[in-house]
From Swiss-Prot:
Assigned protein family: Belongs to the ATP-dependent AMP-binding enzyme family. MbtB subfamily.
Protein name: Phenyloxazoline synthase MbtB
Gene: mbtB
Cofactor(s) listed: pantetheine 4'-phosphate
Organism annotation: Mycobacterium bovis (strain ATCC BAA-935 / AF2122/97)
Region (Condensation/cyclization): 96-394
Domain of life: Bacteria
One of the Pfam families matching this protein, by short name: AMP-binding
PTM comment text: 4'-phosphopantetheine is transferred from CoA to a specific serine in each of the two carrier protein domains, leading to their activation from apo to holo forms.
A biological-process GO annotation: secondary metabolite biosynthetic process
Annotated spans, Thioesterase: 1188-1413
Classification via PROSITE patterns: AMP_BINDING, CARRIER, PHOSPHOPANTETHEINE
Gene Ontology MF terms in the entry: acyl carrier activity; ligase activity; phosphopantetheine binding
Enzyme class, spelled out: ligase
């Protein structure tokens, strides 16, 4: 054991070196974080020590950051003290010009440059402009030439196979530098030219070069140096080295000589892993356990499709001056928080505030130079790795708590950093079956020194413009030391994010940093809202709109109108039209009857029965009598209706129509009897607007219906807003489609009658017939509709020219598609159209948005917005944390004000959960997901209960539906997850263009949503099913889609077997690299959905280039093709001679299926061991020298060659395999046919020393199963062990005789073969082929026709029956009959396919059979 004191001194020296201080300045017991040691440098120590076999991890070091604790940990744990890096001996210089591997981050950037990559088509590069004076072009050129000689990576070339090479230096050739002389150009032209240079260079992809210098000479001896570096060749630390060396060389000073190269460094890393294997394995296992639970990257508000088209970045920056930096870092260290984590936490905070979740995945690049040589820190190259942080700020209400959470996330991840973040991402992609990116990055360069050393700024000037970008990155936040302070930068992919989002986020982060630097209180106090003041003001103005509250109840307006215009029409219905006076009389009769039956003010009256015009009088009478109405329609199941009656605390019941079948436990009146009685005088008493008006029962998430209690004044706020907004009056006629159970009926009745208009009632017989609605509109010249979106969709389908009278159409209750407004404008040009938002709990509606120009709605609208709150209402969009969401951030919509319900009847707990207090007001939590636009408009984005998990991602089904509906030719869509516990996404789509197909929809959708949001199944329907309440019937959609998928026999992507030799070869290469069985990879399966990633794609391309002699194939081709079928087509299209490629593929497959012994035998046939124990027509495929073998028996007419691929698949599973050849075919064509199955079995049994290969597993297909059975009987009688018989697509022995004779005439034999489907019909038209085939088939048929076996004949071996589920000759019952012929175990398996299912499932069958051998 190393003495702790000695260990302490060594550790202190290393820490002092990292901190740039004297060792004696560090006290052994001092907290090193307080001394300036940050997380990045602590990780450097961990990496350095772990490479020397010292078992330490970041979390342990971070928990006790003192030299004293660390020395005890190291000395006690390992007995090994850290040592200095040894001086190099033989450098082992590699040859310049030889290819060498890309580093992991290099590879990621190389792949990301390709256009076919998600968020790709972008070079990782850093561009800087230095504004200085008198920079000399010739001196700069000379310095750059020497710089390129010093750092070979400035000459690097990236090769198509995913490697890199450094060509020899070009002798005396100068480094190219472009010089633009603008010294004598007008100032406005100078500015224009400089802007053009910046625009061209700041986002270019350097073509064949990785480092570019340009110099602009400006008036007054000013200069601007333009420096562009491809980050694939050099990381940020290397950039500093490059500029420092360039400045020194420009000044005539020679930097220290280098005795090591980046190429040697990479080769050393590749040749010998620098971390002990147990460490790597442990860290990989640690991440593997967490893969299923890892969160998504931050879901920030983006423009639809924006990230697919934008390739430029913009920068936001803020400089923290030295005083602010010192104050911020001192306060952080006092809390045990490193400066880097303080800045990371401020960034994480804004991500949480503007993201869909406070838990997310954050990408953290690390600068990691392994000390393999003393000169490593002077090299230029890519030394970066990455960490993925699982950041969870849930419940972290203070800055200190957030910083601790982020620091703990870093400690946890850094403690297992031997498995890098890029590998974790690839594993996560494989787990989810889709490419997962981490496009939000936080890069800390604290502790690495100033961004530009003083020598650089002295020689070249002040950096005036800096921009960086990287492939597959949307937001890269960086913190770096600059000019004595800290520079906080955001490089953001331009045009991707919603307007104003990035500016608001960046401002919030900077404000938080300044607040934390200013005082200690800011660390521990609850953080202020992220809502910018300007956004808060907009919302406050809209929430503050008021209108004079009504002092009347819902029915008061009707009775006033009845007095003012008694003869005006009030109701048009199939049961009879009513004037206001007639309707008043009916309502009074109802009120009087209820009072006579014992109704007291506030009692609840159930209204049961079908929808009729008389129901209008019923509800008016109930309200006039002081009651509360509770409707129950005829569609309610009896049990549910009775539960509603019990839960609803009903006092009386009023039945409309015939007596109902529901058991009503309260006094009941028949409406027909009430209206038929003598007119009754009833004068309504004074109304109370605060009293309850109605109780509507809606479905509950638990399955128990919940009764929403709504008071008169709440509903009146909606009614009066409606009347004011649409200027409704006595001339208006309303189509009353909604049943009383639907809250839309409140407006249909009370808004119409309060304004003096008339109601056109859609009765029970008409309410599911949109053509009847159109007739009513046309007949009665209806002017106003209050509809669900589904109803309007159905109406517009049949409306024709019958809707022109409409002038006010309000649609709400579900997604309001923009196309509804456009279609309505065509059929009713004078109609005003408004979308509304709300719920039964918000007294029908709470918000409104009127469409002003339906023909020119923005194409990216997913729906008509919810709009703005009604007067006297207020809205909030609330995050999970309870905070207000900033603009464009989705959260739960809360509604407050006059227009909300009182609660749920008899459900105080539910009422308390959904109606909450905040800021002195009661708010209803709608469960709707909404977001604010910059002008205060609310947009509905879905339902919280419609969020699902797909491939590990949280997905809003409404977003998928909205994207589908934006596609050309798509009329309507509904998305769902198929039932059964899967995460298979499916969609039902209605199209109005016959050219639109399910596949074209999926392809177009890829331009709008990420891969995991593209439905695996798209089914075209004539109409999307709706519920009676006008909402999408999601249960019915799910059932339809599930039935369609079940009908097609596939819940996943359809498996397609290879059709050509080339496709089989490509499948073999892809399957091997993915680590999958061959038959688990179909030719139409997406490589990346199967778990492929950029690294594996590179390996596939390398394999194809090498094994199939296709040097033109590039990795970009793999990303473009994605499937084996497309890849085969691409390769064939590039070949002048496609047959050559097929031949090469066949050779590859032959070799790939050979064992080492086969290869050696082929290379040296003299050494191939003879097989004297077997007849030459017993085909042997050597798989192992272990006991046990499989013996394959072909089908009738089948040759041994037909089972070559099965044999090779068995060999691939390390199984010795034999295939027998029957007489009358191939190399036994001259051998006489066997007279019987028994004789054939005996001949085969005597063909070899089978006891030497036992135990045997027999496999027979069709007739071969019968031959195998007789072979097994012979073997068991002669003491040769048989483990199992696999009977494939064959009759059981005892059933053969009853099947009758098989055909013997040539024509009938050929017809039978066509029916079985095992032979290409084209071949059967070839006379030569038929002459070879038919004699063999007829011989086998004759033997089989004479076969008979009693049902009690058994073998001891297990029998496994296997068949195809679509085999019309051998049914499941026939296969089951094999069970009677074994005294051992019996199993039955089915594969998708017909009689010759085996051709598509070779590998799966081989795995099953081979598992039986051992």
């Amino acid at each position: 054991m190393v003495h702790a004191t000695a260990c302490s001194e060594i550790i202190r020296a290393e820490v002092a070196e990292l901190l740039g201080v004297r060792a004696d300045a560090l006290h052994p017991g001092a907290n090193l974080v307080g001394q300036g040691l940050d997380s990045i440098r602590m990780m450097s120590l961990v990496g350095r020590w772990r490479r020397k076999g010292i078992a330490v991890d970041f979390a342990t070091l971070a928990a006790t950051p003192t030299i004293e604790a660390w020395s005890q940990l190291v000395s006690a744990g390992t007995g090994v003290a850290p040592t200095a890096v040894a001086a190099p001996g033989d450098a082992g210089l590699s040859q310049e010009g030889e290819p060498f591997p890309l580093a992991p981050m290099q590879h990621a950037m190389w792949v990301g440059r390709h256009d076919h990559q998600q968020l790709g088509g972008v070079a990782g590069h850093l561009y800087v402009e230095f504004d200085g004076a008198r920079v000399d072009p010739d001196r700069l050129r000379a310095a750059a030439t020497r710089l390129a000689l010093r750092h070979p990576m400035l000459r690097v070339q990236f090769l198509p196979d995913g490697t890199q090479r450094i060509p020899p230096a070009a002798g005396s050739r100068d480094f190219p530098i472009s010089v633009a002389d603008l010294r004598h150009v007008a100032p406005d032209v100078v500015d224009q030219r400089l802007a053009g240079i910046r625009d061209a260079k700041s986002h270019q992809q350097l073509d064949g070069a990785v480092f570019e210098l340009a110099l602009t000479l400006l008036p007054g001896e000013r200069t601007r140096l333009h420096v562009d570096l491809d980050m694939q060749a050099a990381d940020a630390m290397s950039y500093r080295i490059l500029l420092a060396d360039l400045a020194a060389l420009y000044d005539g000073r020679e930097p220290p000589a280098l005795g090591y190269t980046y190429q040697e460094y990479r080769q050393a890393i590749e040749a010998e892993e620098t971390l002990p294997q147990p460490v790597r394995d442990a860290d990989r296992d640690w991440w593997a356990q967490r893969i299923p639970q890892l969160p998504d990257p931050p879901a920030l508000p983006t423009r639809a499709g924006g990230e697919r088209d934008r390739r430029r970045s913009t920068r936001r920056w803020h400089w923290l001056d030295p005083q602010t930096r010192d104050a911020l870092f001192a306060r952080a260290r006092a809390r045990g928080i490193t400066p880097a984590m303080t800045l990371a936490a401020a960034f994480a905070n804004v991500l949480a505030r503007w993201s869909a979740s406070s838990r997310f995945l954050l990408n953290l690049p690390l600068f990691s130079r392994q000390a393999l040589h003393p000169d490593v820190d002077l090299l230029v190259g890519d030394f970066t790795s990455s960490l993925l942080l699982d950041v969870d700020l849930t419940g972290a209400r203070t800055a200190a708590a957030r910083a601790q959470a982020v620091q703990e996330a870093l400690r946890s991840a850094a403690g297992h950093s031997a498995y890098p973040g890029l590998s974790v991402l690839r594993d996560l992609s494989r787990h989810r079956g889709t490419q997962v990116l981490a496009p939000v990055v936080f890069t800390s360069a604290l502790g690495l020194g100033d961004l530009f050393c003083p020598d650089v700024t002295e020689q070249f000037g002040t950096p005036g413009w800096i921009i960086s970008q990287g492939p597959q990155v949307l937001l890269d936040a960086q913190v770096t030391e600059f000019d004595g302070g800290v520079l906080v930068n955001w490089d953001v992919r331009e045009g991707v994010f919603a307007p104003g989002v990035i500016d608001a986020m960046f401002t919030h982060q900077v404000d938080e940093l300044l607040r934390l630097a200013a005082g200690d209180d800011a660390w521990d106090a609850p953080s202020p809202s992220a809502l910018p003041a300007a956004q808060r003001a907009v919302r406050a103005a809209l929430n503050g709109r008021t209108a004079a509250p009504s002092t009347e109840a819902l029915h008061d307006g009707f009775f006033r109108q009845a007095q003012q215009q008694p003869d005006a029409p009030a109701v048009f219905a199939s049961s009879g039209d009513l004037s206001y006076a007639q309707l008043r009389d009916q309502a009074s009769a109802v009120a009087a009857a209820l009072r006579a039956a014992g109704l007291r003010v506030g009692d609840t009256v159930a209204v049961l029965g079908p929808k009729t015009g008389e129901q209008v009088a019923a509800v008016l009478g109930i309200l006039a009598a002081g009651g509360v109405y509770l409707p129950i329609g005829v569609d309610q199941p009896r049990d549910r209706a009775e539960r509603i009656l019990a839960t609803g605390s009903v006092n009386l019941a009023l039945v409309c129509g015939p007596p109902c079948q529901v058991r009503v436990p309260v006094p009941t009146l028949l409406l027909a009897d009430v209206l038929a009685a003598a007119p009754a005088e009833f004068v309504p008493g004074p109304s109370d607007p605060t009293a309850l008006a109605y109780v509507l029962f809606t479905s509950g998430s638990t399955g128990e219906p919940k009764g929403v209690e709504v008071a008169h004044d709440a509903a009146m706020n909606t009614v009066e807003t409606f009347i004011r907004h649409f200027e409704l009056g006595a001339a208006d006629r309303w189509l009353a489609l909604a049943t009383l159970e639907c809250d839309m009926s409140v407006l249909d009745i009370f808004a119409a009658l309060r304004s003096g208009g008339a109601i056109v009632v859609v009765d029970e017989a008409q309410r599911r017939d949109p053509d009847a609605w159109a007739r009513l509109i046309d007949t009665y010249e209806v002017t106003a509709l209050n509809f669900m979106p589904g109803w309007l969709d159905m109406l517009l389908e049949v409306g024709g020219g019958r809707l022109s009278s409409l002038r006010a159409v309000a649609v709400g209750g579900d997604w309001v598609r923009p196309d509804l407004a456009r279609r309505l404008q065509v059929q009713a040009p004078s109609a005003r159209f408004a979308g509304l938002g709300g719920a039964t709990e918000t007294a029908v509606h709470a918000t409104i948005f009127e469409v002003q120009d339906a023909a020119n709605l923005p194409p990216d609208w997913a729906s008509v917005p919810y709009g703005v709150p009604f007067p006297n209402n207020a809205c909030r969009v609330v995050a999970d944390s309870g905070d207000d969401c900033p603009d464009w951030v989705a959260g739960e919509l809360w509604v407050s004000g006059r227009g909300i319900a009182r609660g749920y009847r008899g459900r105080p707990e539910l009422t308390a959960e959904r109606f909450v207090e905040h800021d002195g007001r009661t708010w209803y939590r709608t469960g709707d997901l909404a977001r604010y636009w910059h002008d205060g408009t609310l947009e509905f984005v879905g339902r919280a209960d419609h969020r699902v998990k797909i491939s590990g991602y949280r997905v809003e089904l409404g977003e998928i539906e909205a994207a589908l509906q934006r596609l050309p030719g798509v009329h309507a869509a509904a998305a769902t997850v198929l039932p059964g516990g899967s995460d298979v996404l499916a969609a039902a789509v209605c199209v109005d263009d016959a050219g639109v197909t399910a596949e074209s929809i999926r392809q177009q959708l890829a331009d709008l949503v990420p891969a995991h949001m593209i439905p695996r199944h798209v089914t075209l329907l004539d109409r999307i099913p709706f519920t009676d309440s006008g909402k999408i019937d999601r249960a019915e959609v799910g059932a339809l889609l599930a039935a369609e998928v079940e009908r097609s026999g596939d819940r996943s992507a359809p498996y397609a077997a290879p059709r050509t030799v080339l496709q089989r070869a490509l499948r073999r290469i892809v399957a091997d690299i993915l680590g999958r069985a061959n038959d688990a990879v179909g030719v139409h399966d997406d490589f990346f959905a199967l778990g492929g990633d950029s690294v594996l794609a590179t390996q596939v391309v390398a394999g194809i280039r090498r094994w199939l002699d296709s040097p033109s194939l590039m990795v970009a081709d793999m990303f473009a093709a994605r499937t084996i079928a497309a890849l085969a087509q691409l390769l064939t299209g590039r070949e002048a001679n496609a047959d050559r490629l097929e031949l090469v593929a066949e050779v590859y497959l032959e070799i790939a299926n050979m064992t080492s012994a086969d290869v050696m035998a082929a290379l040296d046939p003299i050494e191939q061991p003879a097989q004297p124990a077997f007849k030459p027509w017993v085909k042997r495929f050597t798989g192992t020298d272990k006991p046990g073998a499989v013996l394959v028996f072909p089908h009738a007419g089948g040759a041994a060659a037909a089972y070559r691929w099965l044999a090779k698949s068995l060999v691939a599973n390390d199984v010795d395999t034999f295939v027998v050849q029957y007489p009358q075919r191939a190399d036994r064509r001259s051998h006489p046919a066997a007279d019987s199955i028994e004789a054939l079995a005996l001949e085969l049994f005597e063909a070899g020393d089978w006891h030497l290969t036992a135990p045997l597993t027999l496999f027979g297909h069709c007739m071969g199963a019968i031959v195998a059975f007789e072979f097994a009987r012979l073997a068991e009688r002669n003491g040769v062990p048989v483990r199992a018989l696999w009977a494939s697509s064959g009759q059981a022995p005892s059933t053969v005789a009853a099947s009758g004779p098989l055909p013997t005439a040539d024509r009938d034999v050929l017809a039978d073969m066509v029916d079985l489907g095992g032979t290409d019909p084209v071949l059967l038209e070839d006379e030569e082929f038929v002459e070879l085939l038919v004699p063999a088939v007829k011989a086998d048929y004759r033997a089989l026709s004479g076969y008979s076996c009693p049902p009690d004949v058994r073998i001891r071996a297990n029998i496994h029956a296997v068949g195809g589920n679509r085999d019309h000759r051998i049914s499941r019952e026939m296969l089951t009959s094999w069970e009677t012929h074994t005294s051992g175990r019996f199993t039955l398996s089915h594969f998708d396919g017909g009689h010759f299912y085996l051709n598509d499932h070779l590998d799966a069958v081989a795995r099953m059979v081979s598992a039986d051998v051992r």
